[in-house]
Amino acid sequence: MRPDYRRRRSGRIPALLGVLVGFGLVATIAWAVVGISVGGGGAAESGSSTGLADTGPPKEILRIVFPEGFTRKEMARRVAAVNVIAEEERGIVPSLNPKAYLAATDRTRNLPAGFKNVHPPNLEGFLFPATYDFTEDTTSPQLVSDQLDAFEHAWSEVDMEYARSKRLTPYDVLIIASMIEEEVQVPRERTLVAAVIYNRLREGMPLGIDATIRYGYDIPPTQAILESQLERDHPYNTRKRIGLTPTPISNPGLAAMQAAAHPAKVDYLYFVRKPDCKSHYFTASLREFNHYSRQGLLC
């Protein structure tokens, strides 16, 4: 039997959806076969089920979507949003909560195979973005564990041979993938942005990726980066520092990870947004870069 669509809704739901849309997401509430589906951002379907018991009375299944490129803080905000929707729309109070989720992402003792020698401050980069099913009894550590399992499965499809030939570690590739995820909106550009990063690392040039500065200073996408922030020395200021950032700046999907391991074979050193504010111009010439930069000033 389908739920009654005419049931009165709280005023918090439209307001919450407005917040989600404000983050550049497409957020919807849809009645699935059972439970609630909160969608957005084009994340891949994982088919993962977190904390779903095989015994006892059936529990209503809820669904949470983490889009590619979300940071762990954005994922925690998504957990909070889903909790509100579950309570307001279904009268369910999930065990998941944003504070416990962030705390769980601070624990780095059980990193996936291939990353055992890495000692990051948190699980940024390892929280695989996908769709996850859960019940009201699912805990935050269980959800994070499921994300780590999904990451390990996805990472098994990444061929590291070329990256290793360039003396890059798996963690280096993950960091590059997180940058690609933040910079690219057009899928065919992933390997091109990866090539620019590889080429700049080879030449000893700063990467100059402003998304790293946003991450380091926790600047929202709706807010401009200040000139003082661009000029300040900071571990995540890739305009000032040569090399990769200390950690990933987002949680990338499989396509970005594969591109980071296998860049295009081009000599590009620069990329800048086109006037459409989505795709990029790519060039090996500083002169051309400066010319193209003037065209994309509004982005």
Language-model segment annotations:
Residues 173-174, 234-238, 271-273:
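Short acidic (Asp/Glu) and glycine-rich catalytic loops that position anionic groups and cofactors
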Residues 241-248:
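Short, glycine/charged-rich beta-strand-loop motifs at protein surfaces that mediate ligand recognition
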Residues 187-235, 240:
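Small-residue-rich helix-loop
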Residues 1-205, 252-255, 259-267, 275-299:
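Conserved catalytic or metal-liganding residues and their short signature motifs at active sites
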Residues 225-234, 258-268:
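Short glycine/proline-rich, acidic loop/turn segments that cap or connect secondary-structure elements
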